[in-house]
Amino acid sequence: PNREDMLFPSLMSSLDFYGLPKMAYYYARRAYEDRVLCFREQTDGSLIIYGCSETTDDLDGELEVRLTTYEGKVLWNLRQDACLAADSAVPLAIVPSAVLSAVPSYCCYLAAVFSDERCSRLKNIFHLTAIGEWDHVALPQAALHVDIHMVSSCEFELIIDTDVFVQDVVIEALDCDVYYSDNA
């Protein structure tokens, strides 16, 4: 959560507390992507989903927001048309506080996905848990699926997919250089 009383560096978003784009976010995801989705908690307990764009043109598409348990059950869903306005950070949707307070914060997360007609996709996940609540989260046993593709005689691509949310997946690659990307 991005709250005034919890300014822990790993919790920072791409918006400051005035709802304006934040430059400090560039060293993370925004350094690689011109458009991102981010979340901003309000004092009434609701959550605003922002679309941030550094491009010179608007992007029309569809926004889907899902409140999902770690087992994969969708508890709440919102689907609507949205526009990522050029060179700005604009509110795209609001998740009401009544929706967020209806479930324990450690059992689910919010996923926001923006897609357009060119099949571009932006995705971001917001965990409702506070810093000290991760010990209450009970993640189900995941069914990991791994695909390995040879890129060249000395390069391969490893794709890991799962049926539910997972954390702490460990990949060991011995005696070789490893380049990691989680941009999918």
Regions inferred by a protein language model and the residue ranges of each:
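Carbohydrate-binding surfaces of carbohydrate-active enzymes
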Residues: 1-184
